[in-house]
Amino acid sequence: MSYPKRYGQENNRVLGDANNQCIQSIKMGFLMGAGVGATFGSCIVLIMFAAKKLPRAILMKTLGSSAMKMGGMFGCFMGIGGALRCEVDETKINKNNKNNNNNNNNIHSFFKNSNTEYDISKFNKTKF
């Protein structure tokens, strides 16, 4: 039985296979995090320098390094988040493991066809 393709997987040149999508997810997370972190780092430095009224030469050195540090740090966190949210292509797993569906049916049929009854009357007693 063939599985339907996911939406957007028709054109492999644009999206690529599942591994490429995972790498793209990590890259996109890193870039978004780097942009947000650099902006946040710049805002913090600008507020700090406005409050202390320091010279502009020190501002330029500190602004660049702070933006790079905050952008890199937050970009790494967002890249890790993109890696954690990476989807696994289930069609490849099911093709490799043909007994996967069979095992699930066996487990469900065991529970549905079980003729054992449990005596739960001792649990119904309420004590106040």
From Swiss-Prot:
SMART domains for this protein: Romo1
Protein topology in the membrane: Single-pass membrane protein
Primary location group: mitochondrion
Domain of life from the UniProt record: Eukaryota
A GO term from the CC aspect: mitochondrion
Protein localization: Mitochondrion membrane
Bilayer-crossing regions: 30-50
Keyword terms: Membrane, Mitochondrion, Transmembrane, Transmembrane helix
Gene Ontology biological process terms in this record: protein import into mitochondrial matrix; protein insertion into mitochondrial inner membrane
Stored InterPro entries: Romo1/Mgr2
One Pfam family recorded for the sequence: Romo1
Family, per entry: Belongs to the MGR2 family.
Record-given protein name: Reactive oxygen species modulator 1 homolog
